[in-house]
Amino acid sequence: MRSIIKGRVWKFGNNVDTDAILPARYLVYTKPEELAQFVMTGADPDFPKKVKPGDIIVGGKNFGCGSSREHAPLGLKGAGISCVIAESFARIFYRNAINVGLPLIECKGISEKVNEGDELEVNLETGEIKNLTTGEVLKGQKLPEFMMEILEAGGLMPYLKKKMAESQ
């Protein structure tokens, strides 16, 4: 996993719930590449046709609220979303995203400072977010080191497998 991510912004508002991220009728699918074809269709039905690998989602407050389904961050990862930045996250979504290896950063004021289509450069190690379109630099909350280790391993399961192998 790269610690510097560059991508185009897809912007969403406050209280984007897991049904907007991945509607419940698609929970019969479990593979990231299958889920990708339905991701964000609860908010924008054409999103899967428009999103490109490396793109970044910017959300408002309470992004990922609702049910605790792991399918939502898994679908975002399957669609090639490189990072999710929001004013705040629902805690269960935050944890599920880390568990599946999807980077995210909380950044107060991000909604007012970026527009859809802007290009961002995100430093996961420092939390610095550069809007390459406007030149503005924002400071997000950097992830704790142990969460960075989980992301670098590709998610919680690969991380645990690595740790178990190291201890033998």
Curated annotation (Swiss-Prot):
Disulfide bonds: none annotated. One of its GO terms (biological process) is L-leucine biosynthetic process. The keyword Lyase applies. Pathway: Amino-acid biosynthesis; L-leucine biosynthesis; L-leucine from 3-methyl-2-oxobutanoate: step 2/4; Amino-acid biosynthesis; L-isoleucine biosynthesis; 2-oxobutanoate from pyruvate: step 2/3. GO terms for molecular function: (R)-2-methylmalate dehydratase activity; 3-isopropylmalate dehydratase activity; maleate hydratase activity. Signal peptide: none annotated. It catalyses: (2R,3S)-3-isopropylmalate = (2S)-2-isopropylmalate; (3R)-citramalate = 2-methylmaleate + H2O; 2-methylmaleate + H2O = (2R,3S)-3-methylmalate; (R)-malate = maleate + H2O. NCBIfam families: LEUD_arch. Heterotetramer of 2 LeuC and 2 LeuD. The heterotetramer that can be formed in vitro between HacA and LeuD is inactive. Belongs to the LeuD family. HAMAP family: LeuD_type2 (MF_01032). PANTHER family: 3-ISOPROPYLMALATE DEHYDRATASE SMALL SUBUNIT, 3-ISOPROPYLMALATE DEHYDRATASE SMALL SUBUNIT 2-RELATED-RELATED. This is Isopropylmalate/citramalate isomerase small subunit. It comes from Methanocaldococcus jannaschii (strain ATCC 43067 / DSM 2661 / JAL-1 / JCM 10045 / NBRC 100440). The lineage of its organism: Archaea, Methanobacteriati, Methanobacteriota, Methanomada group, Methanococci. The gene is leuD.
